[in-house]
């Protein structure tokens, strides 16, 4: 986890890349295979989600880092980090996801099913997203996530 500090362009770029890629892939999976949306509805949803994810990626990264710090105050264990990742992901992403589905014309039943399924899947997905985000931050050489070569 990075230290709290000033805005870092590498951090924002890594957070944006991670959110756009991860949410596009996992969102299509949930919408088509679990929620019963058509491919066209899902593609419209995923296309609309790209600018939304670009807009919320860095704020989510800041929120996630805050949640990880709060979890670390309770316990420094990996289990607590995973719980903090899960809580951060579900509480931040669910409202945004519901709005995207509403805009693309999903029925109320599809929205409830998709968001509910997303909450259940997030029990695993939120943790995997945390690992994916950390890997992206390392790849983008975000301070605190990589070791510079001497």
UniProtKB/Swiss-Prot annotation:
Described purpose of this protein according to its UniProt entry: Exports L-alanine.
GO molecular function annotations of the record: L-amino acid efflux transmembrane transporter activity
TM region positions: 17-37, 48-68, 86-106, 111-131
Protein name: L-alanine exporter AlaE
Coiled coil: none
Keyword vocabulary terms for this entry: Amino-acid transport, Cell inner membrane, Cell membrane, Membrane, Transmembrane, Transmembrane helix, Transport
Keyword Transmembrane: yes
Superkingdom as given in the UniProt entry: Bacteria
Membrane topology note: Multi-pass membrane protein
GO cellular component: plasma membrane
Subcellular location: Cell inner membrane
Similarity comment: family membership: Belongs to the AlaE exporter family.
KW Iron (keyword) present: no
InterPro entries per the UniProt record, alphabetical: Ala_export_AlaE
One of the GO biological process terms: amino acid export across plasma membrane
């Amino acid at each position: 986890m990075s230290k709290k500090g000033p805005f870092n362009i590498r951090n924002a770029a890594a957070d944006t890349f991670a959110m756009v890629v991860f949410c596009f892939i996992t969102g299509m999976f949930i919408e088509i295979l679990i929620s019963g949306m058509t491919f066209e509805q899902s593609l419209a949803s995923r296309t609309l989600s790209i600018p939304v994810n670009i807009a919320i990626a860095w704020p989510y990264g800041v929120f996630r880092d805050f949640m990880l710090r709060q979890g670390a105050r309770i316990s420094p264990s990996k289990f607590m980090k995973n719980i903090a990742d899960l809580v951060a992901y579900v509480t931040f992403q669910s409202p945004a996801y519901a709005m995207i589905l509403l805009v693309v014309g999903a029925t109320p039943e599809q929205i409830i099913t998709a968001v509910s399924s997303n909450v259940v899947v997030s029990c695993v997905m939120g943790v995997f997203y945390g690992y994916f985000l950390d890997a992206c931050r390392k790849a983008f050489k975000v301070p605190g996530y990589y070791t510079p070569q001497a």
